[in-house]
Amino acid sequence: MNLCAGPFDRTLERCEENEGNELLQPDLNRMNNLRRVAVIDCGTNTFNLRVVDVGASAGWIPVFGQRIPVRLGQGGVAKGVIRPDRMARGLDALVAMREALRNYRVEEVHVLATSAMRDAKNGHEFVAQAKGLAGFDIQIISGQHEARLIQEGILLNFQEPPAETCLTMDIGGGSVEFVVWDRDGIKWAQSFDTGVARLQMLMGLPDPVGQEGVAKMRPYFDDVMAPLAAAMEALKPTLLVGASGSFDTIADLVGTRIRTERPDHAQSPEPHPSIDPVPLTDWEEVARQLIECDVHHRTAMPGMDPARVDLMPFSAGLIQWVLDQGTVTRMCRAPYALREGVLSRLERGLPLLPEL
């Protein structure tokens, strides 16, 4: 457990912007058996921060959130390095998050890093500099741990586990995590180095990618993700559950995203948001535009996230390959993922990482 330390000793100071309201909250938390925790997910594309108050039986109360695009893997993820400019960008993001956390009395800070950092030859250098500059102890997690934490997060978006067999898919910049599961638990899980930033660098495709570009990706997917194809053939998942950034954008593009995420500064625990349906017929039209249209057209698409506009054609290619395996009949987007999986474990008093 990474306790708040070093530069965070100053979180007890009054912040002029917040007039101390959030600073006083932990005193109330102690009376209510709550504790304030922060989780930072250092992804290949984006660093995400969530601050919540958690309790053994009370669920969690959202306090603060921050999302900073960093493109940590840009220009280096396929070579196994973090470029100096990307390292500086990532460190700046962590320092900014440290400054944001000075507004709150955070009792625990957990910082997890995924594909770009676990594959980079100089990942240890980033970890050391993050400790010196921001006071964070970064824990680099395996792809298997990442997949299981994502799964624990998305389960919170289901009021009841579905009766059918499901396939969770989390598209990251460096890797893509898959979990086949049903109401009895996880049947199969694996992480593949087919993230969209990695694909963009490896494939060298023009803009627009076009159907020719998708055809070029398919043999690579057939080779690298052969274990997934075998698992899908054997286990026959029918519901594709998409998590994280690419699927957030897809739900916005399709227009089905239900914005029920709980606001910051809520006063009490509220129900977790539910999944958003993504009709396959609507997805097919969105996918066509992502693949066949250039960056200017994609940028103008209602719901497009500008930070992902160059990567979404590769997300579309990945999803289309999964659908082409022939078992999936429905698709949805889950609002939660890795960070919420970590929070779920903290709330239940479990070790940060699940057993494999």
Describe the residue ranges of each PLM region:
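A generic, well-ordered mixed alpha/beta core segment in the N-terminal half of proteins
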Residues: 167-175, 179
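Helical "lid/coupling" subdomains associated with nucleotide-phosphate turnover
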Residues: 34-37, 51, 75-106, 116-165, ...
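Conserved ATP-binding subdomain of kinase catalytic cores across diverse folds
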Residues: 57-71, 75-76
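Cationic, low-complexity basic patches in intrinsically disordered or flexible, solvent-exposed regions
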Residues: 14, 23-26
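N-terminal basic/disordered segments at the start of proteins
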Residues: 35-61
